Amino acid sequence: MPKYTDDDIFDDGAPQVAKGFDRGIDYLDIAAKLKKGLKKNYKVLQDTESTANAKRFAGSRVIYIIIALLQLKNCSRISEAIVATKKFSVSKNLNERVVVKIAKSEKDLIDRKTKDKIHTKPRYRDMVFPVDLVDTKIFKYIVKTKYWTKFCEFDSPRKRVLDFLLGHYECNTHSLRYAGINYLLNVEKRDMNVVAKFVGHANVNQLVLYTQTKALDEIFDRKIVV
C-alpha cells in the first residue's frame, strides 16, 4: 500500500480558495423563516399570560428579525440596516425611503506609489422599509417599547443581531446581504451595474467575483447522467 505523510492529507499550509461571503442561504427560504419567527415572537408579546422574561426575549427577537428582514430586502450591510431601522422608527411614512451612509465608504487610505494619505468622501444610498415582509403594525408597536429603547442604548448592536442569527437561523449578516444579491442577479436577472448601484458598491468588481464563485460552485455540484 502507498504511504502518505501528514502533509499529503492534512495540508494546513495550502492556500484557501476564496469563497466570498455567501453561505448558501436561499432568499425566499430565509425570508419565510424570519417572517414566521417575527409572528411567533410578536404573539408572545401580545399574550397576557407570557412572563416578563419571555416578553423580554421576544421583544429583542422581534427587533433583531425586523433588522434582518430590512437588511435582506435592501441587500445592505448590517450597520446600514440598523441605521435605517432607527430612521424608520421616527418616520411618519414607512413607504418613503431613508438615506444612510454606505458603510466603509469614508476612510483614510495610503497611496501605494506616493505614500500620500487619501481621505475618501462618504457615499450614501437609499433604503426601503420591507412592507412586504414586515407587518407595519408590529414595527410601530415595538419601537414604542422599552425593548427598543434598550436596543438603541447597546454599544454593539451589530454583534447582537449577528449572534441571534447564528444561534437561531444558522446564518450570518453577510449571508443575508449576499442572498439578496444572488436573488437579484440570478433569479430576477437584474443588470449587474444596477445591482451594484443598489447595494452601494462603487463598481461591479465585487459582484463579478461573487457571480464567478457561484458559477464555479455550480460546476462542482453538477450531476452527470450517463
Curated annotation (Swiss-Prot):
SUPFAM superfamilies recorded: DNA breaking-rejoining enzymes (SSF56349)
Domain of life of the source: Viruses
GO MF term list: DNA binding
Active site per UniProt: R97, H174, R177, Y210 (o-(3'-phospho-dna)-tyrosine intermediate)
Record carries keyword Membrane: no
Keywords of the record: DNA integration, Viral genome integration, Virus entry into host cell
InterPro entries in alphabetical order: DNA_brk_join_enz (IPR011010)
GO biological process: DNA integration; establishment of integrated proviral latency; symbiont entry into host cell; viral genome integration into host DNA
Function: May catalyze site-specific integration of viral genome into host or helper virus DNA.
Family per similarity comment: Belongs to the 'phage' integrase family.
Protein name: Putative integrase V10
Organism in which the protein naturally occurs: Sputnik virophage
Top-level taxonomy: Viruses, Varidnaviria, Bamfordvirae, Preplasmiviricota, Maveriviricetes
